Amino acid sequence: MTTFYLSLIISLFFLIITLKVFFNTSRKFKNLPPGPQCLPIIGNLHQLKQPLHHTFHTLSQKYGQIFSLWFGSRLVVVVSSLTIAQECFTKNDIVLANRPHFLTGKYIGYNNTTVAQSPYGDHWRNLRRILSIEILSSHRLNSFLEIRRDEIMRLIQKLAQKSYNGFTEVELRPMFSEMTFNTIMRMVSGKRYYGNDCDVSDVEEARLFRGIIKEVVSLGGANNVGDFLGFLRWFDFDGLEKRLKKISKRTDAFLQGLIDEHRFGKRNSNTMIDHLLTQQQSQPEYYTDQIIKGLMVVMLLAGTDTSSVTIEWAMSNLLNHPEIMKKAKNELDTHIGHDRQVDEHDISKLPYLQSIVYETLRLHAAAPLLVPHLSSEDFSLGGYNIPQNTILMVNAWVIHRDPNLWSDPTCFKPERFEKEGEVNKLLSFGLGRRACPGENLSQRTEGLTLGLLIQCFEWKRIGEEKIDMVEAKGITAGKKTSLNAMCKVRHPLKINDVF
């Protein structure tokens, strides 16, 4: 009972502080962007419905291309204009170079010290340099080319074995997910953890890893009101913080085990872990085990689900638009022919295939609200005053459907990217110094996968009804229903070498 009253007193104390901060901030800044009326304490949290980018779209239609909300005591500004977004990350790029801190960043992101969550400064610059040079540089990506090619060809082989004798129904989502996770994990550690042919000899190790990833992804997409109403964290009603603490310990132990395995020479040397451990020997202060584990977490969470989601959306659109599929197939037949499979170095010579990827990213950005930013000082934006410690979100989903920027904005039309400069209007990977550094890897994987799927197979929908394009609710904007389709090997194409 004593503990209960103590918790109650502490909660009331934080409640009073929250109210004081809320009303003081509201009075201090009179030229904030417009927004809906908010309630004491909770602000506008009661108005937030999933998917958030749809809710923000509705609000932007009423309040304009820049509007404000209160998530509890935290001010949030939402931008739905390309011009204002560009102003954010050119003129105000340094001011908006920080990230807000959430519980997931504390427990999964090593207390907000990874390159994704770290505050802007020397530590972040060092992490970005490591990521850009040691992991995602063109040289390093080229050294991992065989891994990407092998994992994609394993996917093609599975589909070919199923459909060599005629059209066969296949479920594509688990295949895409398996391919992207195995690709990243082989780059990181040299191991495959997914599929019946995974090469992890310890079955328990593979099961443990898959369980960790599933829970991390689930908790990473959870809505946590305690991030905005701090006094609720004392109660942890839904047990989220307790689960985050538990999974963070399991994740850390697993990643540390991988590092130790490579440190003592039990794996091959062409992996991300090995390259970073080599640097650790000469620069131990920059390449600590925690930094390496943080980079591993970022690669796994940012480089896997997003690519598989994009490929699934692309195939869904192609199945709904067979004339676009046919045009892409003709491009491949003309430039590549029937005697070999398309390869990664061919993608730059296949503009229509690239346009399909761009159009998919336009309509179905995996992160439709990008990653939130945090202002480090007061600044002006779009004629309004934005105070320090404001969370800024960019609704790329709305910008990518702006009729002032795109003709027939809701239609899937890859041809629009034949016009020079159109690709510069895409925000799928963010803008400014904190834009996603994995764009090159992502587009290599997506381009080659789609190219081979189109080149090697005939595709059609299961029935006359079009593919359902409803979005799921989650941290990445994937399809609500898994993609099933009919596929058949293109017999004129010589693909016997994939068996």
From Swiss-Prot:
GO cellular component: membrane
Pfam families linked to this entry: p450
Subcellular location: Membrane
Top-level taxon of origin: Eukaryota
Binding residue positions for heme: 436
Keyword terms: Heme, Iron, Membrane, Metal-binding, Monooxygenase, NADP, Oxidoreductase, Transmembrane, Transmembrane helix
Molecular function, one GO term: heme binding
Record's keyword annotation contains Glycosyltransferase: no
Membrane association type: Single-pass membrane protein
EC number(s) from the headed UniProt entry: 1.14.13.-
Main location: membrane
Transmembrane segments: 3-23
The protein's required cofactors: heme
Listed PANTHER family: CYTOCHROME P450 82C3-RELATED (PTHR47947), ISOFLAVONE 2'-HYDROXYLASE-LIKE (PTHR47947:SF24)
Functional description taken from the UniProt entry: Probable monooxygenases exhibiting no activity with isoflavones such as formononetin, biochanin A, pseudobaptigenin, daidzein, genistein, isoformononetin and prunetin, or with flavonoids including naringenin, liquiritigenin, apigenin, luteolin, or kaempferol.
Family per similarity comment: Belongs to the cytochrome P450 family.
Name of the protein in its database record: Cytochrome P450 81E8
Organism: Medicago truncatula (Barrel medic)
Gene: CYP81E8
